[in-house]
Amino acid sequence: METKIQELRKANKISQAELADEMGVTRQTIISLEKGRYNASLELAFKIARCFRKTIEEVFIFEED
């Protein structure tokens, strides 16, 4: 799944490690989310969206097959 996490994180001057700490996940999880190798749980998706004051749809781009 494509995300705008990296774009939002950089715009807000937040490191991967800082975001990971705030979300309660590892830095590797944030890296995997940014590269589209991992799909966030619903809970994590809400937390990330809330962190950036965005809706889930603004952060995570869902593409139907």
What is each PLM-predicted segment?
Residues L19, R53-D65:
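Short C-terminal boundary/hinge segments that cap the last helix of small helical domains
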Residues L8, L42-E43, I56:
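Short, Lys/Arg-enriched C-terminal cap helix and immediately downstream tail that follows
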Residues V25-Y38:
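Recognition helix of helix-turn-helix/homeodomain-like DNA-binding domains
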Residues A45-A49, V59:
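Hydrophobic micro-packing sites on short alpha-helices
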Residues K10, Y38-N39:
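Short amphipathic helical patch at the helix-1/turn junction of helix-turn-helix
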Residues T3-E22:
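Short basic helix-loop element that most often maps to the first helix and adjoining turn
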